[in-house]
Amino acid sequence: MKQAFLSCALLLAAATAAPAAGLNLAWNNCAGDAGVQNIAFACDTNTGSRGLVCSIVLGRDIPDVAQSELVVDLVSASATLPDWWRFLTAGSCRQVSLSLSGHEGTNCPGFFAQSAVTNNGAYQVGKHGLPNEARLLSIHGVLAADAVAHFAGQEYGIARWTIMNTKTVGAPSCAGCQTPVCLVFNSARFTTPADTPVGTLLAAAANPGSNFVTWQGGAGTNCPEATPTRNTTWGSVKSLYR
């Protein structure tokens, strides 16, 4: 009888325990919509694109999120970051081949889906003094009056970085598409109108290995340990847009 009671108690605890909070990174879709962990691209076309999707699972309910800050780090297997992976900065080989938007999927509702959201992104090469490393920073926010309630255990899509295939072949083109790369979703911070700039920080994978993806297999990058885990402060991220 005691054994049966104990078994029932364990089953009940398992059923009611909150899912682990954390970060998910996947190609093309969020984790819950069968996003994939690796992209193997033949590097034979200038058309098409793929999406790098950041999603999260909260460990507690937050009634009025107004802003989110995301940090994704990447490292290449080469000694220096290939030209194919140089975006946004004036004069970079693929300056306009990277763009940022929110993400909403079937099993991962958009983090700010029902609000007028602003998405701002930055791309920093050699952020930590490493010539083969870069950092993607993004801020997503709504007006305080439009702050949105979020709930523990639900996967939410937040960001989609779209990487286009422009300048892969022909002339002019940018070398390095075939180079393996590792990308790691290192942190996400959420703030409400009341707790800015402290907020709630997530800095671990929702499931083992769910916070990193690879490009061309990622060989030679020591993925995911190769990327820095030092988080950028909220204030320093916002200063990028002033």
Regions found by a protein language model. Give the residues of each.
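Ser/Thr/Pro-rich, low-complexity mucin-like regions
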Residues: 58-63, 141-207
